[in-house]
Amino acid sequence: MPIRKILCLLFFAVMLSSGVEAKKKDKRSIDRIETNAGVMRVALFDDTPLHRDNFLKLAESKFYDGLLFHRVIKDFMIQAGAPTSRNAGKDVKLGEGNNGYVIYPEFDLPYLYHWRGALAAAREPDEVNPDQYSSGCQFYIVWGKKYRPAAMDKVLFQLAEKGIGLSQQMIDDYEMRGGTPHLDGSYTVFGEIVEGLEIVEKIQGVQTDERDRPLEDVVITRMVVEKKSKNSR
């Protein structure tokens, strides 16, 4: 039996023994992210209420207006939300700023994971953040890559060593849609792009310096809450 099938069967055996049932993820709060590269809309999941409400609060307070996508890695992700990036000069090191608090992680595998277009919370590395608390303001949007079966099998082994299994749906998505599966179970996914995925593709392909900052600033000109779910604060 192929190794991926064995790993999937083991994963679902654990799921069933825990009494976990499949559930549909609602994505009802909508934020519009306006940038000088184009407009994106993100839906926020009600299944991650701490991150959902925090993102809505920051958007409503105009916290993100004027901030940069300060870290961009081709075929991986685009990251924004560092307070120090507003009007930052080209020689300023970005990415270490925060807004004074962290958020308890809200992992929800196998339902919320790092498919292409997923919205997730950035955080400090495990060495200084073993509990994997999320940044209170920094976020990233996944681009990633499409995985061939052999490459996917390698990722499955790596995740299995950490006690993380992927469902067949997740595997299919990573092979057909693309994403960053190695981040699953370590970073909180709390939303997804529902309009403007081509803008993510455009931004992730820009030229960057040795610190992964775009040579030409990519600015969040405005973030607007278009719709709030009935469960949001």
Language model segments and positions:
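Bacterial N-terminal signal peptides
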Residues: C8-S17
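Cyclophilin-like peptidyl-prolyl cis-trans isomerases
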Residues: G19-R233
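Bacterial N-terminal signal peptides that target proteins for export
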Residues: M1-L7
